[in-house]
């Protein structure tokens, strides 16, 4: 499998919902150590708008730890937090009468990095925040950030339609530039550098303990990668 993975320049992990086995993690780690590029789109919290079809509120709860990839991303220099970003700069939702601001759909600003430069605001849906960690030899570049009027709310958290009709008080949104997308570049140390490879990994390829120069991007919203188009007005988020 590693040989097959190595034929691709990029692997995308898009909104996983099932636990990664140690073998899955090992293959991804060794793919990165071989110079492969990774894009992670990870939900820190389970929260879906469909849940409001069954009542006026629902409980958003942490799911990141269930994925069993905490150790991988920690080793590479990033942590997905089990919280939700609320932002005064947000997209709205239509209640059939008006379009009201929904603070759980932050509109993230793109930074000046060439991969995101000149993009309009990026709509998040129940996005979590990211923290970068100390990791030798890894350059970290912010890609997506909140506005200067944002805040983090820890999960479990009750998401209620009442928030749709209560105008946000900017004074309580006192956090800025909350990170939701980051680029990591450099020479990575394997998460298995000081661990034995899973028995089922086989021994057909040597275990790599350090990568060639490579990069990976981590986003704390599994829905970023969805191709949503507003057919009525393409300039507005759907």
Residue ranges and their predicted role:
Residues 1-238:
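Acidic, S/T/G-rich, low-cysteine, solvent-exposed domains in lumenal/extracellular/periplasmic regions
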């Amino acid at each position: 499998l590693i040989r097959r993975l190595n034929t691709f320049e990029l692997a995308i992990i898009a909104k996983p919902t099932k636990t990664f086995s140690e073998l899955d993690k090992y293959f991804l780690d060794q793919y990165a150590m071989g110079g492969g590029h990774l894009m992670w789109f990870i939900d820190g919290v389970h929260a879906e708008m469909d849940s409001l079809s069954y009542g006026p509120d629902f409980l958003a709860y942490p799911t990141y730890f269930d994925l069993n990839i905490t150790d991988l991303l920690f080793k590479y220099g990033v942590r997905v937090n089990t919280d939700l970003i609320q932002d005064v700069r947000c997209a709205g939702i239509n209640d059939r009468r008006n379009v009201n601001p929904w603070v759980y759909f932050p509109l993230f600003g793109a930074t000046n990095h060439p991969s995101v430069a000149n993009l309009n605001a990026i709509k998040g849906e129940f996005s979590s925040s990211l923290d970068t960690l100390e990791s030798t030899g890894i350059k970290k570049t912010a890609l997506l950030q909140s506005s200067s009027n944002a805040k983090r709310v820890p999960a479990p958290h009750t998401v209620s339609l009442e928030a749709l009709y209560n105008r946000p008080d900017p004074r309580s949104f006192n956090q800025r530039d909350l990170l939701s997308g980051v680029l990591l570049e450099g020479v990575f140390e394997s998460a298995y550098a000081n661990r034995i490879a899973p028995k089922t990994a086989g021994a057909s390829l040597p275990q790599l303990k350090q990568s060639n120069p490579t990069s990976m991007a981590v986003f704390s919203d599994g829905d970023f990668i969805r191709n949503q188009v507003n057919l009525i007005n393409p300039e507005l988020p759907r």
